[in-house]
Amino acid sequence: MAEKCAFWNEYDSIAGHICYCELAAFNRPVNPNFLSAIGCSPEKRVECMKSMEYAVGKGVIPEELAPPVTTTAAPVLSCDPPPEIAKTLVGVAQKKATTPAPALVMLALLAGAYISLGAVLFIIVTNDLSLYIGDGLSRLVGGLSFSLGLILVVLGGAELFTGNNLLAAGYLDKKVTGKQVLNNWFWVYLFNFVGALLVVFLFYFSGIWQANDGSVATRIINIAAAKTSLSWSEAFFRGILCNWLVCLAVWIAMAGKDAISKILGIMIPIAAFVAAGFEHSIANMFFVPMGILVKGSELAQSLVAPALLQGITWQTFFINNLIPVTLGNIIGGVVFVAAAYWTCYLRPVEGNKIATDGKGIL
C-alpha cells in the first residue's frame, strides 16, 4: 500500500499501517471528492478496507501489510565451553590414533621442525635483549616469540609429542586403546627428533648463529649449558610444569572458533612456560644439539669458557635432560590435563552428571 497511496502514514503502534481512507472507520466522513483527490479507486478501497477491519479488530492484517517481524539470533559463542572441549578432545584422539603411518611420520617431522623454528626465533630475539629491557621482560618477549612453534603446529597441522599426550583422554574414555596411544607416541617422538635435527643442521649451515658479533652463538651455548647442567629431579619437575601449560594451550586452542582465538589461547600459556624456565623435550631436541654443534666452532671457543663447553655433550643431554624432561612432560600432559578434565566432564558417574552445564569449575 505504501507505493499505492501517497497519504500512507509511517506506522501506528496499535493498528499497523493506516491510510487516510480509514478515517471513515472512526466516524470521520470521507466524501467521494476527497477520495478522488487522493487517487483512491474502488480497487484501492478494497485493500484499505482490509487494513481498516484490522484496525478496528474485525480482521487479520494481510501478509503484505503486516509490519516487519524482527528476530534476534541466539548469540554465537566465540569458544566452546569446557565440556564440549573434552568431547572434541576425545574425537581428536580417535582421529590421531588411526592416522596412517606415512602421514603420521611426516606430520611428526613437521612438528619437530616447527617447534625448532620457534626456538630459532627465540634465540635471535633474546640474544642480547636482556641488556636493554632486563631479564624478566626479555623472558616474556622470548616466550611470545617461541609460541610461533605451537601456533604452526596447531594451525598448520602437525603431530607434536607433548600435545599428543592428550590422547590419554581417548584411552580413559575407552575410545582409543593403550597400544594405539603408545604407538602414536613412539613414532611422533622419534620423528619430532628428526624434524628438530633437520632444523639444527639447516640453521647451523646458514651461518646465522654467528650474527651480532657472536652474541647469538653465546646465547646458544648458554642455553645448552643450562639445560645439560640440571639435576635429574629439576629437569623432571620442570618437564611436568612445562607440559601442563603446553597441553592447556592445546586445550584452549581447541575451544577457539577462529584463528585469532586459537593464537591468543596458545601464546599466553607458552609465554608463561618459557619465561618461567620450564623444560620442553621437543624444544630441547633443537637447543642442545645446536649447542653441541656450535661449541666446536672457533667462534664459540673464543667467546665461552672451556669449562662451560665441556658440559655440553650427547651423554649429558640424554641423561641430565631429555629422559627426565620427557617423563615429566608425559605426566604433566596426561595427569594434569587429559585425566583431570576427563574426570571433570566425561567420567561416568551413576545418578549424577558432572559439570555439563557449559560452565567451567571455579
Question: Can you describe what each PLM-predicted range is?
Answer:
Residues 1-64:
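Cysteine-centered metal-binding/redox modules
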Residues 62-362:
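Alpha-helical transmembrane segments and their helix-helix packing motifs
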